[in-house]
């Protein structure tokens, strides 16, 4: 455990340059979704994530991990990965049986779903904090933070009974503690290092403007779309000159399938006030060259489309003239 701060420093500050701030994922977590249809049928699904970037999935039939990136194992050996797979496989079998044995005691009614999320996250002070949360029907019932375990008050009596049940299994509690406090931070930091080239890449955003559904009579909804950028932090704002428009509404930053991000920023304005507005995009990949798109001006996509149409027409005219001249020449002969 004493090596973790040194590993963290090596990952966050490559080459010892304090100005090279890592802008990649700040958490790793595993999600478990267990569906119980009846007393004889249950299905367990699992996946591992760096923030919103999926690293692997769990194939429940053979009980093996499906790695989605070449560096998804971090610096863990094949033997360590196999050992963790076996541990997770045994855990899921025991978890399923244990839940089915206590359905009546906990007054559960089929079908139901239990969700767990466990992992570790990096805080601004460069400390790694581990966590585990369990939920039934979308309501949390148990929470573990570092080495502290407690029922969630919102979970009521069921949360208390589950907590009292789980703490009886000392071996399970010790295994969970080791996974959360030792294995998770070590894996998290190693996978950040193994995937550094991809996680620290810079991908420039693309931006375009459109109008959204009419908010009301005499009004316009201006939409600024920004997509394909990485890393995640981005600044998008509607502007009038150098002044920010306070009515700008920025949506959530959502992931694309190719590990980039997208979002949109909207502005509700009177139709007569749209002239002179622009959308400004700031992103680390752009340096000091912000993207600025002016409302009412042709976008680059529109210009490209027009250029293609014009070029195609010119080509067709040239071909027609060539065929006409050739036909005229052959007719004379």
From Swiss-Prot:
Glycan attachment residues as annotated in the record: 38, 75, 146, 258
Localization terms from the record: Cell membrane; Endosome membrane; Lysosome membrane
Positions of the Ig-like domain: 185-295
GO biological process: adaptive immune response; antigen processing and presentation, endogenous lipid antigen via MHC class Ib; antigen processing and presentation, exogenous lipid antigen via MHC class Ib; positive regulation of T cell mediated cytotoxicity
Motif (Internalization signal): 329-332
Keywords: Adaptive immunity, Cell membrane, Disulfide bond, Endosome, Glycoprotein, Immunity, Immunoglobulin domain, Lysosome, Membrane, Signal, Transmembrane, Transmembrane helix
Main location: membrane
Listed Gene3D superfamilies: Immunoglobulins, MHC class I-like antigen recognition-like
Function comment: Antigen-presenting protein that binds self and non-self lipid and glycolipid antigens and presents them to T-cell receptors on natural killer T-cells.
Name listed for the protein in its UniProt record: T-cell surface glycoprotein CD1b-1
């Amino acid at each position: 455990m004493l090596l973790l701060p040194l590993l963290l420093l090596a990952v966050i500050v490559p080459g010892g340059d304090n100005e090279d701030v890592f802008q990649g994922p700040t958490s790793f977590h595993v999600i478990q979704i267990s569906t119980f249809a009846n007393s004889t049928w249950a299905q367990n699904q699992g996946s591992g994530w760096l923030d919103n970037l999926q690293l692997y999935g769990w194939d429940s039939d053979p009980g093996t991990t499906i790695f989605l990136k070449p560096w998804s194992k971090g610096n863990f050996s094949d033997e360590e990965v196999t050992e963790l797979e076996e541990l997770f496989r045994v855990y899921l079998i025991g978890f399923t049986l244990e839940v089915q044995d206590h359905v009546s005691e906990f007054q559960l009614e089929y079908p139901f779903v239990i969700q767990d999320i466990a992992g570790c996250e990096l805080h601004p002070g460069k400390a790694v904090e581990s966590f585990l949360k369990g939920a039934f029907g979308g309501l949390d019932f148990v929470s573990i933070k570092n080495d502290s375990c407690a029922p969630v008050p919102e979970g009521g009596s069921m949360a208390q009974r589950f907590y009292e049940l789980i703490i009886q299994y000392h071996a399970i509690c010790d295994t969970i503690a080791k996974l959360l406090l030792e294995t998770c931070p070590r894996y998290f930091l190693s996978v950040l290092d193994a995937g550094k080239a991809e996680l620290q890449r810079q991908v420039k955003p693309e931006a375009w403007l459109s109008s959204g559904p009419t908010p009301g009579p005499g009004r316009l909804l201006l939409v600024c779309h920004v997509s394909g950028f990485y890393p995640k932090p981005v600044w998008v704002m509607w502007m009038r000159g150098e002044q920010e428009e306070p009515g700008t509404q920025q949506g959530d930053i959502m992931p694309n399938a190719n590990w980039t991000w997208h979002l949109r920023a909207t502005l509700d304005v009177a139709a007569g006030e749209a002239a002179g507005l622009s959308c400004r995009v700031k992103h680390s990949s752009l340096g000091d060259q912000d993207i600025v798109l002016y409302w009412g001006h042709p976008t680059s996509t529109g210009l490209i489309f027009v250029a293609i149409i014009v070029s195609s027409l010119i080509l067709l005219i040239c071909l027609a003239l060539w065929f006409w001249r050739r036909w005229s020449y052959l007719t004379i002969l």
